Amino acid sequence: MHAKKQFRRRPLVDRECGSMLIELLIAMVVLAIGLGGILVLLVASIYTNNTAGKDTTSTMIAEHVLEQISAQPANAVSSLTLTDCAGTGWSINTVGASQGTGSGGSHGGNGANLTTTGIIDWTESYAAVPANYAMKYTACGAGGKQIVYDIRWDILTMSNYSRMIVVSARPSGSPVVGGVRYIIPPNMRTIGGM
């Protein structure tokens, strides 16, 4: 007789037991970090989209003021009046001065200070800009929303028959430098003559 060998099956021990749970946990952590990063980018992009609209309006308002001033003869001494969306009539002084001899600092004529590169110096406070060379213009927006813009200009007399006009605008309350809320103020210039 043959003795039968009985083989007993040993239960298989699953050495990978629980590894799926660990993989799932790692995947969830990676996903949470990724979604957190995307959320920050999404919020920043929504905010900068709104900022782009304000930036475009700043350019449009600066161009409007520039056109109003340049439409006057270079030797005109009378002020203009510009009415904003709030019904405020702003007086615009168009009298210029030679470089360094007016109220615009050593690089400007009359008006807001200019930097060494010939752009409006936004570090100068609004109150320090001479009267009628700056305004807090209220622009009409969609749905009756109004935004106030800080507009400044400087007029350099080049000769008896010509002058250079520099105009800049930005939303009131925007930071002077850096950050998500920063809007680069457009600086527009033209030569106006007789």
Predicted regions and their residues:
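N-terminal leader/signal peptides at the extreme start of proteins
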Residues: M1-S19
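General helical secondary-structure elements
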Residues: K4-Q6, N50, S159, P185
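Short secondary-structure boundary micro-motifs
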Residues: F7, V13, A32-G34, L42-V43, ...
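Aliphatic-rich helix starts adjacent to a transmembrane/signal segment
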Residues: S19-E63
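Low-complexity, Gly/Pro-rich coil/beta segments used as flexible assembly/activation regions
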Residues: T56, M60-M194
